[in-house]
Amino acid sequence: MRLIFAGTPEPAVVVLSRLLESEHEVVAVLTRPDARRGRGRTLHPSPVSELAQQHGIEVLTPATIKPNTPDGDAFRARLTELAPDCVPVVAYGNLITEDLLQAVPHGWINLHFSLLPRWRGAAPVQAAIAAGDTSTGATTFRIDKGLDTGQILGVIHEPIQSTDTADDLLTRLAYSGADLLVNTMDNLAQGIATYSEQIGTATYAPKITTEDARIQWTHPAEAVDKHIRAVTPGPGAWSLLGDQRFKIGPVSVAEESDLQPGHMRIEKNRVLVGTGDLNIELDQIQPQGKKRMKASDWARGLQNTEGLVLS
């Protein structure tokens, strides 16, 4: 089939790479415009844009795809000219309007990193880890006008390990999900795809803000650990020590329970922090404006280790 691939971040690159190895023809990619990154705030293309350029594939970067806008109208004209059979989508980042959904024979097919209808929304991997789910997966579905409510075309399952960060889990899902999406494209091309309605209670995973990533030390140690892993590497779990922000993680749950929530104790090679029940041991810490380091190395540089409280 002729495809326009819609995606933006690194996990989408894994999927695009797999599509480029398949029998399908990627005639263009649709991705977010170049964004400013780094200390110099210089413009950089999205990861998907970079891969497409390496393969000589046309890159479409409208600021919006809404109708009756210059960018949106130009995209619609190019969509008609390219005449794709299907538009596979992986974390594109823009709302797809209903007229566009109906403009492609096989529609816009999304690869979503959860077992729908559980964890609809922008942060399904993070939500699964934070909730303590022991398994998750990926779903391909035809996008409709709802939020991740469309008919399902395929699923794969993935166990969640007790040490998984969001990055660990998303990396595995990107690779297994890439195979799922190619299989879905194959089935659509061969006319053997089957659609099924989503069954079960829907739960939601909204985008995680920096404030959401702040550690609540009054929560139980296991919940603190899950929270930290869920927001690693981005936006990154953090806490304040005085007026300085520290990024924290990974951590491990200790056996002791003698510290009050947020209170720290420095031992020879350990940095312990109290939670709502057991203490946790910090493995790594990143002071504001500095590189990540071992928590024990950071502690050795302190002049005063008494009365330290994270909040």
Curated annotation (Swiss-Prot):
(6S)-5,6,7,8-tetrahydrofolate binds at residues 114-117. It catalyses: L-methionyl-tRNA(fMet) + (6R)-10-formyltetrahydrofolate = N-formyl-L-methionyl-tRNA(fMet) + (6S)-5,6,7,8-tetrahydrofolate + H(+). It is an enzyme of class 2 (transferase). Its EC number is 2.1.2.9. CDD domains: FMT_core_Met-tRNA-FMT_N, Met_tRNA_FMT_C. GO terms for molecular function: methionyl-tRNA formyltransferase activity. GO terms for cellular component: cytosol. It holds the Pfam family Formyl_trans_C. The keyword Protein biosynthesis applies. Keywords: Protein biosynthesis, Transferase. It comes from the Bacteria. HAMAP family: Formyl_trans. PANTHER family: METHIONYL-TRNA FORMYLTRANSFERASE, METHIONYL-TRNA FORMYLTRANSFERASE, MITOCHONDRIAL. Belongs to the Fmt family. Attaches a formyl group to the free amino group of methionyl-tRNA(fMet). The formyl group appears to play a dual role in the initiator identity of N-formylmethionyl-tRNA by promoting its recognition by IF2 and preventing the misappropriation of this tRNA by the elongation apparatus. This is Methionyl-tRNA formyltransferase. It comes from Corynebacterium diphtheriae (strain ATCC 700971 / NCTC 13129 / Biotype gravis).
